[in-house]
Amino acid sequence: MDKAAWSGTTYRVREAIEKAGYEVVWIPYKASRMATNAIKAMYYLRYGWGTKFQYAYAYTRVLARSLDKEKIEEVDAVFFCGMGGLAHYCNISKPIFCLGDGTFRLLKDYYWKGVHPQVAKEIDHFDRIGINASTAEIRASRWAADSVVKDYGKASEHTYVLEFGANIDSIDANPIFPYRGGELQVLFSGVDWQRKGARKAIETIEILNRRGVKAHLLLVGLKEIPERYRDHPYITNIGFLNKNDEQQYRKYIETIRRAHVFLMPTTAECAGIVFSEASAFGIPSYTCLTGGTGSYVRNGINGYALPPDADASDFADTIIGSLNVAEQQRLHEGALRLYKERLNWDAWGRGLRKIIEQETK
């Protein structure tokens, strides 16, 4: 399998489906450059630069026409990894399974702010027709699945939750030793400084040190950090690491294994693959209860999800309050258990197989 063609989560999803015992036939869709540029220009002129034209009526119809209908007729079921609305335009007679980590109703004014009303109408429509066309909807969190039912009217018995697994090779998921004292190594992993809460993470580390807990922050994912933090005594900036590059992937694994706890005080999060990765090593996670994080970080089991308005002092209090040996051991074991039961791609594949068998019996 080509990780460049099936990068990140899509690659892991395809791999998990195959491991679950199914043959996967990739049916690509792609608009021509001319059509893409024409529709993009029209939407940018009409609704403003950067408008999300990918869900426009015109564009999604072009994408749907590019699907190989003969290939669709040859398979037993169709699985959409995002863009499920395309199913509506294809008149597919086979069972349709759609995967996503959110809905437009959730993302509007959460991730996507200031969307033009007409564009919002088109995106919402695209979500709705996809959900209506599918045999079953699969979401990466309870938060997202509830919206499919509440906001789009999908029957709850055809709506499922399968958390995303860790995007690491299972052979590398060897548990660390839980914290037993000494300098606390805290991992932060995220590419968006503001949304992922990097500044709050740094402030938490500063408070920990002021309160007598010697702590050091390992920053991963950020290509650059503000100049004021570049020579910070409590920070090591590892930088952005591309997991498709073997050397950088190994660096990522080595960095995770240095950590005792994972801290990401995010302000918006649909799912939480980084929490699955932390749990794979038995590393407790500390985050905010927002979006889909509650499906990945269970209070008192593999970490703590604080209220969305929690500040750095709150995080420092929670970390300090859970640093005793017994609590760290409990969180360590809970993380490993949750990873084994739900937060890995083999478990995801087994869950998908149960869904397919249930929906096609």
Model-based region annotation:
Residues 175-196, 202-207, 217-220:
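Conserved donor-binding/catalytic core segment of Leloir-type glycosyltransferases
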Residues 116-137:
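Membrane-proximal helix-turn-helix segments that form the acceptor-binding/catalytic region
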Residues 143, 165:
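Carbohydrate-associated surface elements
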Residues 224-255, 261:
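Nucleotide-activated donor-binding/catalytic signature segment of Leloir-type glycosyltransferases, i.e.
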Residues 327-342:
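A short, well-ordered alpha-helix in the C-terminal region of glycosyltransferases
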Residues 263, 275, 284-287, 297:
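Short hydrophobic beta-strand element within catalytic cores of glycosyltransferases
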Residues 267:
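Aromatic "clamp/platform" in nucleotide-sugar-dependent glycosyltransferases that forms part
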